[in-house]
Amino acid sequence: MIFVKIGIASDHRGYKAKQILKDNLYKYEVIDYGTDSEDSVDFPVYAKKLGFAIQNGEVDLGIAICGTGIGMSIALNKMKGIYCAKVSNVSEAVLCKSHNNANVIAMSEDLSEDDMLKIVEKFINTPFSNVIKYVRRNNMVSELEND
C-alpha cells in the first residue's frame, strides 16, 4: 500500500457517496473539503478547495463527487497543476493514473458503493508507468497551461 494523503470533496448530490468513501478509506489519511450536508451548493466552490489543497501540497491525490462527476472535473481541470479524470470504472481509474498521471478523479454519485471503492483503491495504488511516450505526452499537456 502506498501512503498518501487523500483530499475528498463533493457537492450536495455527492455528499452521501463522499461519506461512504470516507468511512471506508480508514487506511489512508483523508481530508474532507466539503460540502457538509445535502443542502444545495455550487460544486465549483468545493472543486476549488480540493484543487488548492493539491496545489499547496496539503494532499497528494483528490477524489471529487457530484451528480455526474463532469462538473467537478471541468472545474478542477481549470486549475494549474490539476489533472482530473472523470472515471466510471476500474479500467479508467488505472489508465488515468498509469498513462496520464492524473492526481484527481471525479465520479458520479450514481455509481454503486462497491464500484466506487474499487475505483478509488485502484486509483490510489496504481503508479505512473514512466513509459517515455506517456511522459512526453504528459509534458505536452502541462505545457498547455502556459498557453
Region roles according to the model:
Residues Y26, M79-K80, N100:
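Short, structured coil segments at secondary-structure junctions
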Residues Y46, L50-K86:
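Helix-adjacent hinge/juxtasegments
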